[in-house]
Amino acid sequence: MAHPHLLAERISRLSSSLEKGLYERSHAIRLCLLAALSGESMFLLGPPGIAKSLIARRLKFAFQNARAFEYLMTRFSTPEEVFGPLSIQALKDEGRYERLTSGYLPEAEIVFLDEIWKAGPAILNTLLTAINERQFRNGAHVEKIPMRLLVAASNELPEADSSLEALYDRMLIRLWLDKVQDKANFRSMLTSQQDENDNPVPDALQVTDEEYERWQKEIGEITLPDHVFELIFMLRQQLDKLPDAPYVSDRRWKKAIRLLQASAFFSGRSAVAPVDLILLKDCLWYDAQSLNLIQQQIDVLMTGHAWQQQGMLTRLGAIVQRHLQLQQQQSDKTALTVIRLGGIFSRRQQYQLPVNVTASTLTLLLQKPLKLHDMEVVHISFERSALEQWLSKGGEIRGKLNGIGFAQKLNLEVDSAQHLVVRDVSLQGSTLALPGSSAESMPGKIKQQLEELESDWRKQHALFSEQQRCLFIPGDWLGRIEASLQDVGAQIRQAQQC
């Protein structure tokens, strides 16, 4: 076996060769190549004239001496046009019912069937056996067929509850294609002089029959780690809960796992990784509605769970909550406590400052910052005489926010613990304390928990960085995963600075 990374590099170069002269079809070519290398079938949905047949034709060049068969189905297509004509001589001389299959589907490695849903029952039934068992019954004999890739195409989906659903379920990968969108790509396509029938693949990159057969065995040896299985099961359970989710058969799940194994194998890995699960977005949908739903669910899985993003945020929330509780406890100990006076016959409770508070101007710290008068405030300066008068007689109280500017009117009160509390317009409060009696620095246990969480985040980010080198996954998905991990990291770092 070639070194895994050398194999991954070779498959990448092979795909690049196949993509030459095709615009905005890289993902389709790569998935077709993956399907061919793992012996799966795929369905291309899209309007006429968007290179569906050319994509299939190109895949022939991925293999040495591969034979291709393509056919446009109509309502009048007969099995003879797909599987070969009957041998008149065998029927006449020996009374044998036998087809001449040379040049037809039973002897082709790459098969492209356009307008597949127009095929009649006789063709569909034989095709199902060919896909399922890689066998073709030719008269009294059952022959193995060499088909590595079946690409079926149409500009429409099969009707629900029709006889076509069985065939549709066998097509593991489903791609919805559209016209070339980018202006530069459209211009390049119009002016390209490349012959579509030329072989763009160097001989050294083409896959031999021996390599193909060996790889089929090695793909099956790729492991499915427990944590990846848990993600798959989570997705399956979530889909089962959604009323509009498509039905996904156990057979489709099993075939999809082999595709994930192939993705890992041709990416140079010995085990399926969470990033491979993105391929399920092209395997589990049934129609336009379910296509969007499946993509949404896999996006949630990838950006919230695959690298423990949500789990780390939950842990962070618990740590921050505990830190806030400790800060509140500390605030209760260090807050400025005023003295309650007798005032039995007074209409309002009267207070005075502690005897050790003697400065003419008092700077009191907010235990947590508040936005007051459109300013983020961390401390307030009071004239001692004004504060004493307010404690004794009530009324209006003013203070300089952050010690600057004019004194502003404040919503100040004394709570049940005899602490001064200032409130913002939404009535959120912050206890006031004298300088030097503010909350202590972050407790060691909280700091340690945040450091452990940051270490776990770095491990998950390193795992993603290592696994994201996957030819078959679009870059925009990788970008969203990276952004989700960076968001978690930023929140952890912010908590460490509090």
Curated annotation (Swiss-Prot):
Q: Return the Pfam families for the record.
A: AAA_lid_8, ATPase_RavA_C, bpMoxR, LARA_dom
Q: Does the keyword Hydrolase apply?
A: yes
Query: What GO MF annotations does this protein's record show?
Result: ATP binding; ATP hydrolysis activity
Query: Where primarily located?
Result: cytoplasm
Q: Which SUPFAM superfamilies match?
A: P-loop containing nucleoside triphosphate hydrolases (SSF52540)
Instruction: Provide the assembly information.
Output: Homohexamer. Interacts with ViaA.
HAMAP family, alphabetized: ATPase_RavA (MF_01625)
Q: What is this protein called?
A: Regulatory ATPase RavA
